Regions:
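Conserved ABC transporter NBD signature motif
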Residues: 63-74
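The feature captures the beta-strand-to-loop junction immediately N-terminal to the Walker
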Residues: 40-42
Length: 224
């Protein structure tokens, strides 16, 4: 049985306004279970554009995308929304926590949306994720009362709540100082090593990328 979690086959993408420009060109690669992969390249090379395609948030592309060996349709948004909630965890540069809720509730929200477990089970799972990340003591604090580095760890716990097949990150350390960036890297590394969590992280930080299992480097919309 294959352990390929994510596969892109000949992905091409064009922007058409005001003129037709190719922004992704013949992108093909795969990521196996437990791999910690970084996606790097200069600003404007297509990293974030590719991540949006790989995450199923952008379906306007040519080629094929497979998640857990299943080809992703381009026209079925309700199916793709379920895939995003169930099989993909997202961590962005900005944490996007909801200040009106405490830390625990923020982590629970994607689990409640999935509607696979009871609220009590989702709460238990959320506390487990917070414990793994060493921030269970923050569970009842309001989201706007924790530090920037802590907020990003809360966002990682939230990304883990549904036990996703892959975590995708778009510059998750871009807003953090070196200490907190290293902390986030160590968390990702531990998730990969101990829990066989698959990760694909867009980063412009060379010191972050060089410590991952593999670097996919982009230039002018191509993998080089």
């Amino acid at each position: 049985m294959s352990n390929t979690i994510l596969e892109a086959k000949n992905i091409n993408k064009f922007f058409n306004d005001p003129i037709r420009i190719q922004v992704l060109s013949n992108i093909s690669f795969s990521i196996n279970k437990g791999e910690f992969v970084s996606l790097t390249g200069k600003s404007g090379c297509g990293k974030s554009t590719l991540l949006y395609v790989l995450s199923t948030m952008d379906t306007d592309y040519e080629g094929a995308l497979y998640i857990d060996q299943e080809e992703m349709p381009k026209k079925n948004e309700s199916f793709l929304a379920k895939i995003r909630n169930e099989k993909i965890g997202f961590v962005f540069q900005f944490h996007y926590l909801l200040n009106e809720f405490n830390v625990l509730r923020n982590v629970m929200l994607p689990g409640l949306k999935l509607n696979k477990y009871s609220e009590e089970e989702v709460e238990y799972r959320a506390m487990e994720k917070l414990r793994i990340l060493g921030i269970d003591h923050l569970a009842l604090k309001q989201a706007n009362h924790v530090s920037g580095g802590e907020k990003q760890r809360v966002a990682i716990a939230r990304a883990l709540i549904n036990d996703p097949h892959i975590i995708m990150g778009d510059e998750p350390t871009g807003n953090l100082d070196k200490k907190n960036s290293d902390l986030v890297f160590d968390i990702f590394n531990r998730l990969s090593d101990e829990f066989k969590q698959t990760l694909l992280i867009v980063t412009h930080d060379p010191s972050f990328a060089e410590r991952t299992h593999r670097i996919i480097k982009m230039e002018d919309g191509k993998i080089i």
